[in-house]
Amino acid sequence: WGRTRIGLHSGRVIAGNVGGSGRQKYTALGDVVNTTARIESLNKQLGTRMLASAETVASAQSAQKWRSVGKFQLVGKAEGLEVFEAVGDDADPDELALFQQCLETCHSDVCVAEGMVRDYVQRYGEHKILSMHLRQAIRGEDSDVIILKKK
């Protein structure tokens, strides 16, 4: 069995019955639907289970804890979108803090970031998200937006 992955995004959609007299289907259409699907798909690349756009996290009135995993230019999009990962109530606050420090440092000081990520890995194990950001910084890419090539 596979693992369920969830992507969350907010906005207006067109929803209703679509199709002809012989076959109708209730569905939602629009950019928000496509962006949500891309966010859900991003889970697989990052090794996460639940991701949400910054817009959704900001508008949700929930006790759910979230951590930023960075900005991503989703396939078919021109701009980067900040994405957040859902974390459990039992998440280690020290791990969360070091993760955020590593993420921020990857885009400001690659030499310091390498040491910080190494420290993170020794304490908590390998992390796909940090590895992705660090690789981009090492390649010398100026942007803090990771450009995704596949859905």
Model-derived segments and their meaning:
Residues 1-16:
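A short glycine-enriched loop-to-beta-strand structural element that forms part of the catalytic core
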Residues 13-15, 36, 43-151:
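Cytosolic regulatory/linker segments at or just downstream of nucleotide-handling modules
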Residues 24-29, 69-72:
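Allosteric regulatory "coupling" segments in signal-transduction proteins
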Residues 11, 23-24, 33:
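Generic signature of intrinsically disordered, low-complexity, basic-rich segments
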Residues 29-36:
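Amphipathic alpha-helical transducer elements in NTP-driven molecular machines
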Residues 1-3, 23, 78-80:
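A structure-centric signal for secondary-structure junctions around beta-strands
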Residues 17-22:
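Short acidic, glycine/proline-rich loop/turn micro-motifs
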